[in-house]
Amino acid sequence: MGKEIEKKFIVSGDAYKSLAKGVLYRQGYIFFDKDKSVRVRVFNDKGYLTVKGTSTGISRLEYEYEIPVGEANEILEYLCEKPVIEKLRYKFQFEGFTWEVDEFLGENEGLVIAEIELPDENAVFKKPDWIGREVTGDPRYLNSNLVKNPYKNFKE
């Protein structure tokens, strides 16, 4: 059984760009509701199918499988809700933890989110200076919700 434990934060500034090279990710959702999602993702010429369950606090079940990239691209094109999410991901280590910063493109341009995966829900970690407010529990910032409610329509 896979379990994902993560926190999400708004990013201010672009200092993260000096820490890693951005990799283009394209992902789409075959199915999603408030409790679960099935997505396809393509990056680095590889395809992935991911199933995620209901969030409980900052954790949820997650299962991910590599699939042929050609099939992943076809699923993105023909079976996923539109628009497909496109983003540049910057992945790096900071104070012993892996951070991922997603700089969204297209309908969600202007949104930059940082995520940290944790070993358990009580893990203590240090944040880089450019990390802003936490949005872990805010459903607007779920990638699946950004398909139907893009960042350009947010009223902060």
UniProtKB/Swiss-Prot annotation:
pH dependence: Optimum pH is between 8 and 8.5 for ATPase activity and between 9 and 9.5 for PPPase activity. Hydrolysis of ATP declines sharply as the pH is increased to 9.5 or decreased to below 7.0.
InterPro entries referenced in this protein's UniProt entry, alphabetically: CYTH-like_dom_sf (IPR033469), CYTH_domain (IPR023577), NeuTTM/CthTTM-like (IPR012042)
Keyword Transferase found: no
Enzyme class: hydrolase
Domain CYTH per the UniProt entry, residue ranges: 2-148
Record GO terms (molecular function): ATP binding; ATP hydrolysis activity; inorganic triphosphate phosphatase activity
Reported impact of E62A: Strong loss of ATPase and inorganic triphosphatase activities
Pfam families, alphabetized: CYTH
E.C. no: 3.6.1.25
Physiological role: Involved in the hydrolysis of the beta-gamma-phosphoanhydride linkage of triphosphate-containing substrates (inorganic or nucleoside-linked). Catalyzes vigorously the hydrolysis of inorganic triphosphate (PPPi), however it can also catalyze the hydrolysis of ATP to ADP and phosphate. It can use ribonucleotides such as GTP, CTP, or UTP and deoxynucleotides such as dATP, dGTP, dCTP, and dTTP.
Subunit structure of this chain's protein: Homodimer.
Protein name per UniProt: Inorganic triphosphatase
Organism: Acetivibrio thermocellus (strain ATCC 27405 / DSM 1237 / JCM 9322 / NBRC 103400 / NCIMB 10682 / NRRL B-4536 / VPI 7372)
